Amino acid sequence: MTNPKLVLAYSGGLDTSVAIKWLQERGYDVIACCLDLGEGKDLDFVKEKALKVGAIKSYVIDVKEEFADEYALIALQAHALYEGKYPLVSALSRPLIAKKLVEIAELEGAVAVAHGCTGKGNDQVRFEVSIKALNPNLEVIAPVREWSWSREEEIEYAKKHGIPIPVDLDSPFSIDQNLWGRSNECGILEDPWAAPPEEAYELTAALENTPDVPEIIEIGFEQGVPKTLNGKPYSLASLILELNAIAGKHGVGRIDHVENRLVGIKSREVYECPGAMTLIKAHKELEDLTLVKEVAHFKPIIEQKLAEVIYNGLWFSPIKDALVAFLKETQKNVTGVVRVKLFKGHAIIEGRKSEFSLYDEKLATYTADDQFDHQAAVGFISLYGLPTKVYSIVNNQKKVNV
């Protein structure tokens, strides 16, 4: 009788490498799955390591374009910043990882999937809620959450079973990265008073090491989608990665955040999102030019709710679909070019233009070219202020009669 198959979200690190052997001991044939989300990792090495540790098959899937087009783009168009600061770096990738785990499980006839999350973080929720939404019949196993070993016990287990110990195991930081950005926690970062050491950063330069001359870039959008950088066409994934390099060189996109986790605790995280933060700022400026007032004023309510929904692991849910439907409707005329100056940690908008611009210079100007009907303001003010005037009359009369 053959063993049941299980698909493991595999990173190549100690936890998921140990998980392969741990799951084998519980009777599963393990299939490893690693996604290329644009983090720059040596994925051929990861694929081979999974097989050496004991996986019967090892998948490495390039999902950079899918991640950019179907996940990061929604976050960009929603200006999605959880609690006003966090661009949802890890939260965006988890539903895509879950989707691929389920797809491979169904392809391979697996009965279960597994992830390497602890019982303390948000990712366990994001993975398991997403997996159950996509295939309720799959069992979900969380080895790290179940075994409850200390780090020393885990290393001892790895040595006993010939599992390679990562060379960066002594690093105090826990890092997650994809093309939308890089998150970092643990070590000295657990003290919210401590300044993050420079070694905590990788994508962005320290301000004192950034160029002393600003760099001007132009980003072209079509219906809310970034299409060009300095006039050159890019796929969205390539454009984000290019912006990570350019804006990161100028120190743009460093975020230090004490956030409220889904599981009920506060956590201090350090993020680097140079491309994401530059794009969000540019996109918002183009919306300011092209959206009517009522939509522009209501959209932030949708944005905040969507950021919370994504952060809380509800990507595959009716509420997320409903919010995105509104979002897509708002992007029809968000077409144009935004000029950005990158300098000393800042992305400064210096210009914007669009064929759908609702800005009319002849209405806005105070020069002789002014075409605004000033006399129309008299009647407008009278009607606009009428409810306030009536309220004041009624309440003042009551005060007099007391």
Curated annotation (Swiss-Prot):
Keyword Amino-acid biosynthesis in record: yes
Enzyme Commission code(s) on record: 6.3.4.5
Lineage: Bacteria, Bacillati, Bacillota, Bacilli, Bacillales
CDD domains tied to this protein: ASS
InterPro entries listed in its UniProt record: Arginosuc_syn_C, Arginosuc_syn_N, Arginosuc_synth, Arginosuc_synth_CS, Arginosuc_synth_type_1_subfam, AS_cat/multimer_dom_body, Rossmann-like_a/b/a_fold
Top-level taxon in the UniProt lineage: Bacteria
Name of the protein in question: Argininosuccinate synthase
Assigned GO CC terms: cytoplasm
Keyword Oxidoreductase carried by entry: no
Gene Ontology MF terms in the entry: argininosuccinate synthase activity; ATP binding
Chain positions recorded as L-citrulline binding sites: Y86, N122, R126, S174, S183, E259, Y271
Similarity comment: family membership: Belongs to the argininosuccinate synthase family. Type 1 subfamily.
Residues at which ATP binds: A9, Y10, S11, G12, G13, L14, D15, T16, S17, G116
Subunit structure: Homotetramer.
Catalysed reaction equations from the record: L-citrulline + L-aspartate + ATP = 2-(N(omega)-L-arginino)succinate + AMP + diphosphate + H(+)
